[in-house]
Amino acid sequence: MLLWSPEGLHGAHPDRAVRQRTADYLVALVHFAEALGAGVMILGSPKARTAISPLTPAESAQMWLETLEPALKVCEVTGIQILLEPLPETDVVQTLREAVALVEQVNHPFLRTMLDVKSTLAESPDVPTLIRRYAPYIAHVHLNDANLRAPGYGTTDFSPILQALQLVGYTGWASLKPFDYFPSPTTFPLQK
């Protein structure tokens, strides 16, 4: 949502005015998600949360949470859940472990995390164990291979991942999230 535009937004910026604009934008996105009938809003956006000097990643994570507070208040009315997406491309919340720690710290009923297979593989090759460990916190799943392609177009074995999700009783959405549409955007969904 914040990855490429609008320009000038950052949830952990040292400038309070930038954080306020970002907070206002997140509130607007919650209302937009409600209008669409969405149940969740995934907050990935590594460029909009990476630590900016002189802040450390830990300090930035705390600022990021403060920036989320107004949106979480609106979530109490709309029922939208905000999901922190762990991303190794940033230095703020790279792993499920870190995301769950922040979710536990905030202890808000509308703040959870999600599982992105590609990103989780950077944390551990044993994704099923992480699913079992963090199941109560996972409210959405992105299915993508470590090579950025769709399941079946790389070396990741999705069978144990899907079995673990079933074992823990996961009933939420799972979306395909390839970044490389090999062999082509029009043919990859029709193959395999």
List where the protein language model places each region.
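Short, flexible segments with low predicted structural confidence
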Residues: 4-5, 73-75, 137, 145
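Histidine-acidic metal/acid-base catalytic patches
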Residues: 37, 93-115, 120-192
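Active-site acidic/histidine proton-transfer and metal-coordination neighborhood
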Residues: 9-113, 124
